[in-house]
């Protein structure tokens, strides 16, 4: 584990994978992008990008089973933590969570 002082000073990369429910139509899957777009105005976000899983070749280390991934960069851990409690974020999760059956989050200190 990294020293706490380093984690507090570094930028945070928030990487999220979403597995959408299989019964969703192609149109509903594309419409899910509204979830990501609704997060963009949140003041704590430094960068935000998202996309569908790439159809890359099958390899033992590759997992393309998710539908969408989201990558957000925060200036620091405090901004990350504030984002988690932000009303816009919480409202978006409440509105769109009916579309997924699994979510995995990886938070990383980056330089």
Predicted regions and their residues:
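Generic secondary-structure microfeatures
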Residues: 19-22, 43, 52
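Compositionally biased, intrinsically disordered low-complexity regions
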Residues: 18, 23-26, 111
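Short, conserved charged micro-motifs
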Residues: 24-30, 80-82
């Amino acid at each position: 584990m990294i020293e706490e002082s380093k984690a507090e000073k570094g930028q945070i990369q928030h990487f999220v994978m979403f597995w959408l429910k299989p019964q969703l139509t192609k149109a509903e899957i594309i419409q899910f992008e509204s979830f990501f777009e609704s997060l963009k105005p949140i003041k704590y976000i430094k960068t935000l990008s998202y996309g569908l899983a790439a159809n890359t070749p099958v390899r033992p280390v590759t997992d393309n089973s998710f539908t969408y991934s989201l990558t957000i960069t925060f200036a620091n851990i405090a901004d990350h933590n504030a984002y988690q409690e932000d009303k816009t974020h919480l409202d978006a999760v409440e509105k769109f969570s009916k579309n997924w059956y699994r979510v995995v989050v990886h938070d990383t200190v980056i330089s």
